[in-house]
A protein has these predicted regions:
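Polytopic membrane enzymes that build or remodel cell-surface glycoconjugates and lipids
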Residues: 1-223
Length: 223
């Protein structure tokens, strides 16, 4: 086990230019708020490939566990299906280049934060008001964490509406009230997503000499 392909860019910056230089590197990569994750990783794990591989594997299995808990929370009677889906995700988590121990840390973190955020949202629907507020706030923090660390899961955020609809439909038979409750429960997460979209499209600017991956079409819609 070692480092592969994109891993070496992180190793180069952290080793030759200092761990704090990862902030510069990821700003050029259009993900300035992902730097904290890699800086923390190098400060804790150092430059030993085996340490990064173990951390990657632990995050992977943490995601699988959270996915299983999420499915069981939404569909308590679907025990077999929950295991099957979780095991399928363990083998194929929607991308093929899993052996990279460093370069895709923000992907694993995104999955981890996203799944935990969804689970907390589901719990918030099922408990009393005080606990619901606590779970909702924690879910919003995790939503912001995964969005600002990497934008990959921004589209998946719309899955929240589906989960909310399923859960609220079980308790509310009237369609108009169902729509209202789903929207009100989704609104806090929609505000977080809106704040991220505003920052990413309007506020954030790449360094002057860097133009790749710029959301030109989206920016033109707002200018």
């Amino acid at each position: 086990l070692g480092y592969y392909m994109d891993d070496w860019a992180y190793v180069f910056y952290a080793n030759l230019k200092g761990i704090n230089s990862l902030q510069e590197m990821l700003t050029y990569d259009s993900r300035p708020y992902a730097a904290w994750l890699y800086m923390l990783g190098f400060n804790i794990l150092g430059f030993k490939p085996i340490a990064w591989h173990i951390m990657s594997l632990l995050m992977h299995w943490g995601i699988v566990l959270l996915l299983w808990l999420l499915i069981r929370a939404v569909w308590p009677n679907r025990k077999i299906e929950a295991i099957q889906i979780s095991l399928l995700f363990a083998v194929y988590p929607f991308f093929m280049i899993q052996p990279f121990p460093i370069a895709y840390t923000h992907i694993w973190f995104g999955f981890l934060a996203f799944n935990l955020s969804l689970l907390l949202m589901v719990w918030a629907i099922k408990v009393n008001t005080i606990k619901a507020i606590t779970f909702t706030v924690l879910a919003m923090i995790l939503e912001a964490a995964h969005l600002f660390t990497g934008e990959y899961f921004s589209g998946l955020e719309f899955i929240r509406v589906l989960f909310l609809w399923i859960l609220i439909s079980r308790e509310e038979p009237i369609f108009s009230q169902k729509v209202k409750k789903v929207f009100l429960n989704w609104l806090p997460y929609l505000l977080v997503m809106g704040a991220f979209a505003y920052w990413r499209i309007i506020v954030f600017e790449n360094p002057p000499e860097i133009t790749r991956n710029s959301p030109v079409i989206l920016q033109q819609l707002f200018t």
